Amino acid sequence: MVGGVGYGSASSFKSATAGNINLKINVAGSSTTIFNANTSVAENKYYSVYMFDSTFNLKVSIFEDDRTPPPSGKANVRFLHLFVGGPAVDIVRAGGSTKLFTFRSYQDHVGNTALTAYTAIDPGPFSCAAVVSGTNFSVSQLPAFDASTGKSYTLVLRGFNNAVPLTPEYVKLVPVEDL
């Protein structure tokens, strides 16, 4: 059981017995269930569960994680587009034109698990931007964070197309350390 995970936050991996499990999500501090589904998990595997969209239109993405360490002297990043109503984007390294991920659309990883694969990067200060695909128009800029050697990160573009700026629901590109 995982509790107290607020909007935009993450928890560590939790163990589960292999086989069929029930995944239930309640509104924080209540017994009101907003998601309830059965899924199957395999022995000795890791899975990520992402919840997104609004409370009453909740979407959940569950996928198996590749826990292979990054290549020697590198860090790993992958990208999830969970920006409700957002355009297709490219993820571009700051200070250059290197595209790490191209033409990524809302929830595209759901039908294509290859889109949850990691890309190796040099460790150290890491910054990038989500830009409308094929343009330089910035949707969101990720402030620099320290990508550590041997660690893996998921870059999540989240938020709502019509959210008020500076609110938690406004579009934001955030790093999640995959523990």
Where are these regions (language model features)?
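Intrinsically disordered, low-complexity polar regions and short flexible loop motifs
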Residues: M1-L179
